[in-house]
Amino acid sequence: MRQHVNPLSRFFQLPLQLPSPGELFDHPEQPIHLDIGCARGRCILGLAELNPGWNHLGVEIRRPLVTAADRDALNSGSGNVRVLFCNANISLESWLAALPNDRLQRVSVQFPDPWFKRRHRKRRVLQPALLLAIAAALQPGRELFLQSDVLAVIEPMVALTELSGCFTRPESDARPWRADNPLPVPTEREQYVLEKNLPVYRVLYRRNASPLPDPEALKSRWQELDNPAETVFTDI
């Protein structure tokens, strides 16, 4: 059972200055995979072991999970994985903007907390400003991977991503949901869901060459749609 925290509470609204890649990794020049909402870090730790030529950063808003996961990261001695505590919508934008060109090569948002009610829209992890910060940091062809076991959670993420115009799905991927996970290590939640023979909804995007849209226009368009995914999927 996952424990929710309210990202809008005053404590989680305090911005944090996150360490630079040079402070986090032994080889900061390596490509970075950023996993937003990494929980206990099973996926990001496993990927770091399998891919020593990449750096792997997990961020998580639940501090006890971060403490345990980052301890494991440091104890691994690999020098290519860390887990940090932060509210992604408050502290990640400046970190992303400061990255060297094409350093960030993959972003994943996997099984975020299910704030699916419309009145909880602002509590969702993938907000317009964060999506645009991700899009600005990714060069064309780099990846954004989304997955959830709750349709009402992933549909708004897909809708927002589609509305931005900054990302394109591979033509070979099944619609509306990708059949498999492109990452070789499942998260804790994914493994639990699959063991229960429950569905997982996945979408892989690649950054295209389109310019960033106006942030306020994107936010307004996203908020005015009661069921944005329904509108967007008709065009896929």
Swiss-Prot record:
Belongs to the class I-like SAM-binding methyltransferase superfamily. TrmB family. Its EC number is 2.1.1.33. One of its GO terms (cellular component) is tRNA methyltransferase complex. The keyword Transferase applies. This is tRNA (guanine-N(7)-)-methyltransferase. GO terms for molecular function: tRNA (guanine(46)-N7)-methyltransferase activity. It catalyses: guanosine(46) in tRNA + S-adenosyl-L-methionine = N(7)-methylguanosine(46) in tRNA + S-adenosyl-L-homocysteine. Substrate binds at K117, D149. The active site is at D113. S-adenosyl-L-methionine binds at D35, E60, N87, D113. Pathway: tRNA modification; N(7)-methylguanine-tRNA biosynthesis. It comes from the Bacteria. InterPro entries: SAM-dependent_MTases_sf, tRNA_(Gua-N-7)_MeTrfase_Trmb, tRNA_methyltr_TrmB_bact. Keywords: Methyltransferase, S-adenosyl-L-methionine, Transferase, tRNA processing.
